Amino acid sequence: MNILQHFQLEGSVAIVTGSGRGIGRAIALAYAEAGADVVCSARSLADVQAVAEQIRAMGRRALAITCDVLDPEQRQALVRQSHEQMGRVTHLVNNAGGGGPNDPLSMSPGEFEQILNFNVSTAYALCQLCVPLMREAGGGNILNISSVAARYSQRHFSAYGTAKAALSHLTRLLAQDFAPHVRVNAVAPGPTLTEALNGVMPAAMRQAMEANTPLKRLGTPQDIAAAALYLASPASAWVTGKIIDVDGGADATVWPA
């Protein structure tokens, strides 16, 4: 087989959460370009409809489904509709999640738990729903979107960093539980120039962060999507339970002090 054929996803059906914008959108488009049919989900229907239209323009099938991953009924509906309308589910990308800086002396335990639920519990629940369908289809692939915040020691990220560290270790543990027919890996992005980050980052902060990054630039959604495609494709057929850092070579936080 030609080496480039190992990066193809033809015959696959992928659910990508949080795929209306940013990293999720880039992953959905990359999977489609590699031959997958894609279910795009997010809280904003307009956003995922636009992404689905781009995927259909590539000649692939696409669904746009509204889903708040914190809502159990919406999670179940997402997976059920994907299976019913696409015929199978082979790939899951747990991209929906997030969280900002926090003050550990003022954030309530309930607020802390919300960050854990948003980033970890929702991914766990979607894996439970999708893995039986993947096994039914003959095998599958799960990709979790973690963060370098999972391994950096930095101020004001005790909630988000803890949640992403939990997601990274959940990735390793589920890889053992779901082997040999379902692989589970994660990408841990560094600072990535999504619409959300661009909207709040002053030029001086960006310059400082780029100066602190060995490769002297911040990431793009396409950087993350390229790593995601590797982990989703047969090119990584002997890889499971691994976290790939895509961070420009940084070994510590590049955020200005």
Region spans (language model):
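Short C-terminal tail/terminal secondary-structure segment
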Residues: N2-Q5, Y152, L229, T240-A257
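Active-site helix of classical SDR
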Residues: C127, A163, T171
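Residue(s) in the substrate-gating loop at a strand-loop-helix junction
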Residues: S147
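Alpha-helical segment proximal to the catalytic Tyr-Lys
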Residues: P132, A175-P180, A237
